[in-house]
Swiss-Prot record:
InterPro entries per UniProt: NADH_UbQ_OxRdtase_chain4L/K (IPR001133), NUOK/Mnh_C1-like (IPR039428)
Localisation: Mitochondrion inner membrane
Record Gene3D superfamilies: 1.10.287.3510
PANTHER family: NADH-UBIQUINONE OXIDOREDUCTASE CHAIN 4L (PTHR11434:SF0), NADH-UBIQUINONE OXIDOREDUCTASE SUBUNIT ND4L (PTHR11434)
Main location: mitochondrion
UniProt-listed Pfam families: Oxidored_q2
Entry's Gene Ontology molecular function annotations: NADH dehydrogenase (ubiquinone) activity
Entry function: Core subunit of the mitochondrial membrane respiratory chain NADH dehydrogenase (Complex I) which catalyzes electron transfer from NADH through the respiratory chain, using ubiquinone as an electron acceptor. Part of the enzyme membrane arm which is embedded in the lipid bilayer and involved in proton translocation.
First-tier enzyme category under EC: translocase
Protein's name according to its UniProt entry: NADH-ubiquinone oxidoreductase chain 4L
Similarity section: Belongs to the complex I subunit 4L family.
Catalyzed reactions: a ubiquinone + NADH + 5 H(+)(in) = a ubiquinol + NAD(+) + 4 H(+)(out)
Keywords: Electron transport, Membrane, Mitochondrion, Mitochondrion inner membrane, NAD, Respiratory chain, Translocase, Transmembrane, Transmembrane helix, Transport, Ubiquinone
The encoding gene: MT-ND4L
Length: 98
C-alpha cells in the first residue's frame, strides 16, 4: 500500500478519534466531521484516478456535494444554537425539538 493512502487513512482515523473525544462542542465536532469528509474526498479522488474508469469520477463529486450540504446544515445549527443559548454545546440540540 502506498504511503499516501496510509496518510489519508490516518487523517480519517484521527478525525474520527477527535469526533469521539471532543463531542461536547458542536464546533469541534463539525471540524472533525469536515476533516473526515476531506480525507474521504481525497481517497475517492485518488481511487477514481487510479481506476481509469470514466464513471468513477462521479463519486468524488457526489461526495463533495454531500459534504457541502452537511457543512451548510451544520453551520445553520451552530448559528441557531449560539444565537439562542450563547453556547455551542451539543446537548442544546435536544432543546430545539418542538
Amino acid at each position: 500500500m502506498p504511503i499516501i493512502y496510509m496518510n489519508i487513512m490516518l487523517a480519517f482515523l484521527i478525525s474520527l478519534l477527535g469526533m469521539l473525544i471532543y463531542r461536547s462542542h458542536l464546533m469541534s465536532s463539525l471540524l472533525c466531521l469536515e476533516g473526515m469528509m476531506l480525507s474521504l474526498f481525497i481517497m475517492s479522488t485518488l481511487m477514481a484516478l487510479n481506476m481509469h474508469f470514466p464513471l468513477a469520477n462521479i463519486v468524488p463529486i457526489a461526495l463533495l456535494v454531500f459534504a457541502a450540504c452537511e457543512a451548510a446544515v451544520g453551520l445553520a445549527l451552530l448559528v441557531s444554537i449560539s444565537n439562542t443559548y450563547g453556547l455551542d454545546y451539543i446537548h442544546n440540540l435536544n432543546l430545539l425539538q418542538c
